A protein has these predicted regions:
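N-terminal post-signal-peptidase region of extra-cytosolic proteins
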Residues: 30-44, 49-50, 64-72, 80-82, ...
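Bacterial N-terminal signal peptides that target proteins for export
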Residues: 1-9
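Short, surface-exposed secondary-structure junctions/capping segments
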Residues: 76-100, 161-163
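Bacterial N-terminal signal peptides
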Residues: 10-18
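Extracytoplasmic
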Residues: 40-42, 49-52, 63-65, 79-81, ...
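Exported/periplasmic cell-wall-interacting domains
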Residues: 98-224
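Solvent-exposed coil/turn segments that connect beta secondary-structure elements
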Residues: 50-52, 59-62, 71-73, 87-90, ...
Length: 224
């Protein structure tokens, strides 16, 4: 098979799995296909803020296309060129989390932790930092800007993104990209943001991270 034929088949696979009709919101258990790169050094990431989409590419070949939740107007996701670093599969927020005592668990900021309380940061699994204090991580993917500037990825997809992106991988964040009109058009979007929040006792536990671990191969077989 020629390289061009492989590229066309790969696009078709993404189209069948990642595209839907006019209703772009996924009903049920959300996931996104991912493919192992031939050369990890050629992997790059594009983030379209207008399309709330992440494109992981090996040169021009799509490896992963998925929805993301971006920063609010008052706390926007930074634009520009970056590189991935500080990958942490079990990251907790240094700013927002919970004040824990024997009497209860109360949401709060780290810098406002009352005396006698223990601060436990909100879980941000599969953290990939691209600028100090900003990163990709697992979380609810709302259909509107909702974060403090980070880029949230559905919990089923975040392990794949984490595996594809290495320290030093180039990341471009822009208002839009040409891919928005091709591989990113009518992208499937999760509805996990409608789910009730897990119990606070669960969020402060290691079990939260344990339950998000994906077993087995994360990647699809390349089309033959």
């Amino acid at each position: 098979m020629t390289k061009n034929s492989f590229f066309i088949l790969n696009i078709a696979s993404f189209a069948l799995f990642n595209f839907v009709g006019c209703n772009s919101y996924d009903v049920g258990n959300y996931d996104s296909l991912a493919y192992r790169p031939s050369n990890p050094n050629k992997v790059r990431v594009k983030v379209s803020l207008q399309n709330s989409a992440i494109y992981v590419l090996e040169e021009n070949k799509p490896l992963l296309i998925t929805a993301t939740c971006i920063g609010k107007n008052e706390s926007p996701t930074p634009l520009g060129s970056f590189r991935a670093y500080n990958k942490l599969p079990r990251k907790r927020s240094n700013t927002y989390g919970f004040h824990v005592t024997s009497h209860g668990i109360v949401p709060g900021r780290r810098d406002m932790t009352p005396k006698g309380s223990k601060y436990v940061g909100y879980p941000m699994p599969y953290w990939v930092e691209f600028k100090s204090g900003y990163g990709f991580h697992s979380g609810y993917v709302h259909p509107v800007p909702k974060t403090h500037g980070c880029l949230r990825i559905n919990q089923n997809v975040a392990p794949k993104f984490f595996a594809l992106v290495r320290s030093g991988t180039p990341i471009e964040i822009n208002d839009s990209f040409p891919e928005d009109l091709t591989i990113g058009k009518n992208i499937r979007r999760p509805q996990d943001y409608k789910d009730p929040d897990p119990p606070r006792s669960y969020l402060i536990s290691d079990k939260y991270f344990d339950d998000l671990e994906r077993k087995g191969d994360l990647f699809e077989k390349d089309p033959l």
